[in-house]
From Swiss-Prot:
Heterodimer of an RgyA and RgyB subunit. The lineage of its organism: Archaea, Nanobdellota, Candidatus Nanoarchaeia, Nanoarchaeales, Nanoarchaeaceae. The keyword Zinc-finger applies. Residues 41-197 form the Toprim domain. One of its GO terms (cellular component) is cytoplasm. A zinc finger (RG C-terminal-type) spans 117-143. It is found in: Cytoplasm. Residues 213-602 form the Topo IA-type catalytic domain. This is Reverse gyrase subunit A. Zn(2+) binds at C120, C123, C133, C136. Its cofactor is Zn(2+); Mg(2+).
């Protein structure tokens, strides 16, 4: 196997520069056209500017074109002339215009309406449809429409368009959006999928192109529509109940909030007295249900058991296990950790970080072998694939470079990365050590169990007291339990009141989401972040505490819509989305079930909601007072949109009518008068007069 120090970097750089000069000559027309015809002009579209810059530098120093505020990197692989440009994430979001039901039309099938995303450059707020920021009023806006125009212009210059967005359902949706907007300008559009940003992976992706995976796209559409229909509808109920439009609800968000609240209730019920007893050599913590009146001056340690055991390494990181460890060891939020991991991926330092697989490829094993044999010796290398090959690998480094070497290469300019911080380095170190340990042999440990006795209290202490034979502990050192049998003088005692049931950390919540099957690698951090943003929970000493607002919101949602935010239903729903992604389930059937749930939300009795009114029109005859108002408003010659509340406006947009006055009037009548409809007796003499109005309701239903 070729070692890193054996690679002639100068020769490789020279070859790349020669290839680049050759392509420049081709473009100037100085090389025969038969050679020129063999080289394809490729527009390579990725998500982030970081990734675009990293990829461009794999093939020599790129030239840069600036088109508006978009950078396009131009380079060559020898076979392709690449123009690499970034979408900067999603281009479209469901419209907030009053189109259909929350931006989804019902024709033969459900048709979501998307609008280009806009971002305020002053306050960072993201929105659609408005011409200025709805939060701060700024007109300093980054509009995805500008990027769409650039992509279309560049597509016309290319022979082939390759879309290299992230290798998951969300990335596939972005790829589909890009495909849709440039299809009229270039017919040769394909998907390029890679799971690490390395030269080798990019070259492989360019050669193994495929079509868009429409099943992945359908799954992502279902996720988005479900969030808009159910999440938005539940959120609107919260706005009405609590008079605050910053509140939100969702299938996953609400059960997770419930986990935290229930844990907090258990925490309060299991209060106890804690005593940290300190000697000159160690500290032991005891728990008592009642306070102690006096303390012993000594503590006694008795050995219970000692045994030799083989300690195998843990598998390499998945998203949830990385978040769990990084929260504890780096003391960072899950949102921050995912942002750092995204950077490491885009810089080509780690593989894709949204994964639930522990599998390691042959290439990954070779990377581990190179490092382990050079650093510790061949006898410590113990290769493992860690499960069957799937869509993704585990999270691992892309090169046999440890943290010390990485820092050295950054300082000497061998690796050039803009914006890398100590936090990035610490996270990389965590990933690197876990991965290398997973490919090393077990170590042999001496485990010892002790009983500690003090002031009539007992507690068990156990841990590793010695290493008999080294293994993966060389890359992940083990802290030994420094305690021995004997009687020791107590030099200090600290007392506090705590709980036998600890509050959850962010790491615990991620683990619960994984266990209950209500989260995915792409959603773990987002869900936790929302709970903080809505002020449903706060964090104290890394422990999660529900706020009064969070408790009230959860009580309200579970009392009225408990079955819709149930853990089991949420898990079943996510399983259905997985089946859609695998082509095993029709996504339209799932959307139809969502529509039924949406109507169920509307039909709750607390306020004047759309479906209440609609169903009462069907159930009762319309009294004269309603018809008279309807007839009077019909005589107007102008529509007054300001009369429409959010609910009547939603009905107005859903009505399949051409007459604006009729639409507005019926919408107002349904919302304003449904209570009258339930209380007034049937007035049969008016039946013929209001028959037309009933027919309009029938059309809506």
């Amino acid at each position: 196997m070729l070692r890193l120090e054996e690679i002639d970097l100068d020769t490789i750089k020279k070859e790349l520069d020669e290839e680049r000069k050759k392509v420049e000559e081709i473009m100037k027309g100085n090389i025969p056209t038969e050679i020129k015809d063999l080289i394809k002009m490729v527009l390579f579209i990725v998500e982030s500017p970081n990734k675009a810059r990293t990829i461009a530098n794999f093939f020599g120093k790129p030239s840069v074109r600036r088109i508006g505020n978009i950078k396009a990197y131009e380079t060559t692989t020898g076979k392709y002339i690449l123009t690499i440009v970034a979408t900067k994430g999603h281009l479209f979001e469901l419209t907030l215009k009053e189109e259909g039901v929350y931006g989804v039309l019902k024709e033969k099938e459900y048709v979501p309406i998307f609008s280009p995303i806009k971002k305020c450059l002053d306050c960072g707020h993201q929105f659609v449809d408005e011409d200025k920021c709805p939060r701060c009023g700024s007109e300093n806006i980054d509009d995805a429409s500008d990027r769409i125009k650039v992509l279309r212009d560049l597509a016309q210059e290319a022979d082939i368009v390759l879309i290299g967005t992230d290798p998951d359902a969300e990335g596939e949706k972005i790829a589909y959006d890009v495909y849709s907007i440039i299809r009229p300008y270039n017919k040769n559009i394909y998907r390029a999928e890679f799971h690490e940003v390395t030269r080798q992976a990019i070259i492989k992706a360019l050669e193994e192109i495929r079509d868009i995976n429409t099943n992945r796209v359908k799954a992502q559409l279902v996720r988005r529509i479900e969030d808009r229909w159910i999440g938005f509808a539940l959120s609107q109920r919260l706005w009405s109940r609590f008079k605050k439009k910053t509140l939100s609800a969702g299938r996953v968000q609400t059960p997770v909030l419930g986990f935290i609240i229930k844990r907090y209730e258990e925490y309060k019920k299991n209060r106890a007295h804690y005593y940290a007893v300190k000697t000159s050599d160690f500290e032991v913590t005891f728990i008592s249900d009642d306070p102690l009146e006096k303390y012993d001056k000594t503590i006694k340690i008795e050995k219970i058991e000692e045994k030799e055991s083989e300690k195998k390494p843990l598998p390499p990181y998945t998203t949830d296990s990385l978040l769990r460890d990084a929260v504890i060891e780096l003391r960072l939020s899950v949102d921050k950790i995912m942002a750092l991991a995204q950077n490491l991926f885009e810089w080509g330092l780690i593989t894709y970080h949204r994964t639930d697989s522990t599998h390691i490829s042959n290439l990954g094993i070779q990377i581990a072998q190179t490092y382990i044999e050079n650093t510790f010796g061949k006898e410590y290398f113990y290769p493992r694939h860690w499960g069957e090959e799937g869509t993704h690998e585990a999270i691992r480094p892309t090169k046999p470079i440890d943290t010390e070497t990485l820092i050295k290469m950054l300082r000497e300019g061998d690796i050039q990365i803009q914006g890398i911080t100590k936090e990035h380095i610490r996270l990389y170190d965590l990933i690197f050590r876990r991965f290398i340990a997973s490919q090393m042999k077990p170590f042999i440990a001496i485990e010892t169990k002790f009983n500690a006795v003090w002031s009539n209290l007992n507690t068990t202490i156990e841990g590793i007291t010695d290493i008999k034979e080294n293994g993966w502990n060389l890359i992940k050192p083990i802290k030994l339990l420094a305690i021995k049998e004997g009687e020791y003088e107590v030099i200090d005692v600290k007392h506090w009141i705590g709980s036998k049931v600890p509050l959850y950390t962010q790491a615990d919540v991620i683990e619960l989401m994984k266990e209950q099957n209500i989260g995915r690698p792409s959603t773990y951090a987002t869900i936790v972040k929302k709970l903080f943003e809505r002020y449903y929970v706060i964090e104290k000493n890394q422990r999660l505490i529900p706020t009064e607002r969070g408790i009230k919101v959860y009580q309200y949602l579970t009392e009225r819509f408990g079955h819709l935010v149930d853990v089991k239903l949420t898990a079943d729903l996510l399983e259905k989305m997985d089946r859609i992604e695998n082509g095993e389930l029709d996504y339209m059937d799932v959307l139809r079930s969502f529509k039924k749930e949406l109507i169920e939300i509307w039909k709750t009795k607390e306020t004047k909601y759309i479906a209440d009114g609609i169903y009462k029109w069907k159930e009762y005859s319309v009294p004269a007072i309603v018809y008279e108002r309807y007839e009077k408003i019909l005589k107007r010659k102008k529509v007054y949109p300001e009369y429409l509340t959010p609910w009547s406006r939603a009905i107005y947009n859903a009505l399949p009518l051409d007459n604006e006055i009729e639409k507005q009037t019926l919408a107002l009548a349904i919302e304003k008068d449904f209570e009258i409809l339930t209380k007034k007796p049937i007035l049969r003499e008016y039946k013929k007069k209001y028959e037309h109005l009933k027919n309009l309701v029938d059309q809506l239903l």
